[in-house]
Design a protein with these regions (language model features):
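N-terminal alpha-helical "arm" segments
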Residues: 1-27
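Sequence/fold signature of self-assembling virion shell proteins
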Residues: 2-8, 142-182, 186-194, 199-303
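Glycine-rich, mobile lid/loop segments that gate access to catalytic sites or pores
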Residues: 118-154
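Short alpha-helical segments and helix-capping/turn motifs at coil-helix boundaries
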Residues: 19, 72-73, 180, 266
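Assembly/oligomerization interface modules of large self-assembling protein complexes
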Residues: 25-84
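Residue-level signal for secondary-structure boundary elements
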Residues: 20, 24, 28, 32, ...
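Residue-level preference for alpha-helix termini and adjacent loops
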Residues: 59, 78-80, 93-94, 140, ...
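Long, contiguous amphipathic alpha-helices that act as assembly "spine/axial" helices in icosahedral shell
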Residues: 76-133, 195, 281-283
């Protein structure tokens, strides 16, 4: 966009930098509260390969031989970093004639765009987790037929029938973790500690977490998904503005593998356009957001 002597862009650099990074620092960030954030290793991509655990120890008789086991070579996946950028232009007359400092709104608006983009891209991993985003096994992140490498167990971290957030459907999410096994079929002792919901579900989620008694009944039944009753472990609520479905919700354990990798954080640069004398400013960043292994997360698309 153009907002319109001699080269003058360098004289604006300090002002633009200050306006941009002051606003960028204030931009609320959600993804870091949900994703595991890492600095990217060298190179233009990240490769991860899976190796199954070993099986359980076998009983041997006195003088008997120990049986040797081998892990299963697993899935291998490569993730490439994506580049995002945007810029604006200021003309010399605009800068000189703007007595009220309106031009300062432009770096602030650019900072807001830069601050939101990582959140949008990161939470799209959840938004598309039922339909296009895949984990290392090639299945959708949330699916009904993941298969373990060594034991051949079928794992469903999505219900066969989608359902609205309720005591019954949330209980099914906790039960998923109770019955979870690793790639060798051994029990996995992981429990969810975070319920991720869109803004439309925050009231229903709070009721489920805080009500001691079962919701919507006059009986004295316990609300089994309230940590107060000691049936499920404590968990926290995260309400996201970036979940695009008004019904989908997710349970996450600390061991989940939703990963955000920074390759290059926001960098602001400037130059002058020789043909127009406009001062050009741009910001760019490079990162990747993905899920490597599905087991630490349960998702329900809702209804």
């Amino acid at each position: 966009m153009i907002t319109n002597t001699k080269i003058f862009g360098n004289s604006l650099d300090k002002d633009i930098d200050k306006e941009f990074f002051d606003e960028y620092a204030l931009a609320p960030s959600e993804f870091a509260k949900v994703f595991h954030v890492q600095s990217a290793p060298a190179g233009d991509h990240y490769t991860w390969s899976e190796l199954s655990p070993l099986g359980q120890l076998r009983e041997i008789s006195e003088g008997g031989q120990v049986e040797f086991d081998l892990p299963e070579a697993g899935h291998k996946v490569t993730k490439y970093y994506r580049i995002f950028g945007l810029g604006f232009q200021i003309t010399a007359p605009m800068y000189k004639d703007d007595l009220t400092g309106n031009w300062k709104q432009m770096p602030r608006k650019l900072a807001k765009s830069a601050g939101q983009k990582p959140d949008i891209v990161a939470f799209d991993v959840f938004n598309n987790g039922f339909t296009s985003e895949t984990s290392a096994d090639g299945q959708y992140i949330f699916d009904v037929d993941h298969t373990t490498l060594k034991s051949g167990d079928t794992i469903a971290n999505e219900p066969a029938t989608a359902g609205s957030l309720s005591e019954t459907t949330l209980q099914a999410g906790f039960e998923y973790f109770d019955g979870l096994v690793d790639e060798a079929g051994n029990p996995l002792n992981i429990q969810p500690n975070k319920l991720l919901v869109p803004i439309e579900q925050k009231y229903a989620a709070q009721k489920l977490m805080k009500n001691v008694g079962a919701i919507g009944t006059a009986n004295n039944d316990l609300n089994v998904v309230s940590p107060t009753n000691g049936i499920v472990n404590d968990y926290m609520l995260h309400v996201s503005r970036y979940l695009t479905s008004s019904t989908a919700w997710f349970l996450l354990s600390p061991e989940h593998m939703f990963t955000f990798m920074w390759k290059d954080q926001a960098a602001l640069s400037s130059t002058d356009d020789f043909s127009t004398n406009n001062a050009l400013f741009k910001v760019w960043m490079r990162f990747a957001a993905f899920c490597l292994d599905y087991k630490g997360a349960y998702g329900n698309p809702g209804a």
